[in-house]
Amino acid sequence: MGLSTLEQKLTEMITAPVEALGYELVGIEFIRGRTSTLRIYIDSEDGINVDDCADVSHQVSAVLDVEDPISVAYNLEVSSPGLDRPMFTADHYARFQGEEVALVLRMAVQNRRKWQGIIKAVDGEMITVTVEGKDEVFALSNIQKANLVPHF
């Protein structure tokens, strides 16, 4: 998935502190608005609880206060990926091969920006998703947003 320059810089800046605490940095989102939000997703083999989120928030806040990479006021949110886990990297798609995913594309493919189907394969920077019985191939750089679709 194509990250913005700011998101790339933030990812580079906070990966080491998050991993030093024993967590995986799943990904980040910076949402601009009246009140901007920096959302950080973390995970671990044992799952994530509120204390884990607080620990990461404290550590990341200290790094961001020193580096000051964001020029606007923002709220920091740290959470687990949840059931509708966001997908950020080729590794995420490979890890959840066989699962259902909802995609929003930056540029339409076949006049559609929204797609939903089963992750079939990952090949470098391309993913294959089976949509209504037909395989569709998408460039990760064209995926604006992707989430697993939970089934209950």
Curated annotation (Swiss-Prot):
GO terms for biological process: ribosomal small subunit assembly; translation. It is found in: Cytoplasm. Disulfide bonds: none annotated. Gene3D superfamilies: Ribosome maturation factor RimP, C-terminal domain, RimP-like superfamily, N-terminal. One of its GO terms (cellular component) is cytosol. Signal peptide: none annotated. The keyword Membrane does not apply. Its main location: cytoplasm. Keywords: Cytoplasm, Ribosome biogenesis. It comes from the Bacteria. Required for maturation of 30S ribosomal subunits. PANTHER family: RIBOSOME MATURATION FACTOR RIMP (PTHR33867:SF1). NCBIfam families: PRK00092.1-1. Belongs to the RimP family. This is Ribosome maturation factor RimP.
